[in-house]
C-alpha cells in the first residue's frame, strides 16, 4: 500500500539514471490511469529500456494505444496471454508449479517477443534447479538479451547466468 513516505516515482527514476540503464526496467503497474504521467516521466528521464506489465486488461490496452512497451502475462492460470499480438513481450509466471519449458520460450522468441521469467523465489520456492534449466535453454536457443529473469537475487543471477 502506497503511503506518504514512499519513494516517489520521479525520485526512483533519478536514482535509476545513476545506474546502468542498459538493464531493462520492469514497471509493475498496480493502479489504472497512470499512462500520461508515466509517459511524461519516462521521456523526461530518457528511459527507453523498460516495459510495463501486470495492469488490468482494459488499462493495458490504453498503454498499448500510448505506445508503451507492454508485456502480457502467461501463467498456469493464464495459458493464453491476452493482447498477445500487440505486446512486445511475455511475463512468464509460475505461481505454484514449474511449467515453463524450452518449447514455450522458443515459441515466444520466434514470434518476436521478449521473455521475462519470474524466478521461483519470488513465490517462496527454491530457484536453483530452475535456474539450471533456464541457463541451458538460454544457451540452446541463443536467446541473449531477449530472455530475462526477474529475481530477488540480481547479483547471484548475474554471476550464475554470465559465468
Show where each model-derived region lies:
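Acidic/glycine-enriched edge-of-secondary-structure segments
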Residues: 1-4, 61-68, 85-94
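An active-site metal/cofactor-coordinating segment within enzyme catalytic domains
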Residues: 1-33, 40-43, 47-52, 56, ...
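Acidic-and-aromatic substrate-binding clefts and catalytic sites of carbohydrate-active enzymes
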Residues: 2-6, 29-36, 94-100, 123-127
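Alpha-helix N-cap/helix-start and coil->helix boundary motif
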Residues: 32-35, 58, 154-155
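Hydrophobic packing residues within well-ordered alpha-helices of enzyme cores
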Residues: 38, 63, 157-160
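Short gly/pro/ser/thr-enriched loop/turn and capping motifs at secondary-structure boundaries
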Residues: 58-61, 124
Amino acid at each position: 500500500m502506497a503511503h506518504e513516505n514512499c519513494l516517489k516515482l520521479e525520485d526512483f527514476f533519478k536514482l535509476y539514471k545513476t545506474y546502468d540503464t542498459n538493464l531493462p526496467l520492469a514497471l509493475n503497474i498496480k493502479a489504472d490511469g497512470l499512462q500520461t504521467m508515466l509517459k511524461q516521466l519516462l521521456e523526461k528521464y530518457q528511459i527507453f529500456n523498460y516495459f510495463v506489465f501486470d495492469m488490468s486488461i482494459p488499462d493495458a490496452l490504453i498503454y498499448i494505444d500510448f505506445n508503451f512497451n507492454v508485456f502480457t502475462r502467461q501463467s498456469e492460470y493464464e495459458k493464453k496471454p491476452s493482447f498477445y499480438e500487440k505486446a512486445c513481450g511475455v511475463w512468464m509466471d509460475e505461481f505454484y508449479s514449474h511449467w515453463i519449458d524450452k518449447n514455450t520460450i522458443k515459441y515466444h522468441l520466434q514470434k518476436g517477443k521478449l521473455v521475462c521469467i519470474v524466478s521461483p523465489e519470488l513465490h517462496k520456492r527454491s530457484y536453483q534447479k530452475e535456474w539450471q534449466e533456464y541457463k541451458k535453454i538460454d544457451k540452446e536457443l541463443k536467446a541473449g538479451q531477449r530472455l530475462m529473469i526477474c529475481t530477488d537475487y540480481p547479483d547471484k543471477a548475474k554471476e550464475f547466468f554470465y559465468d
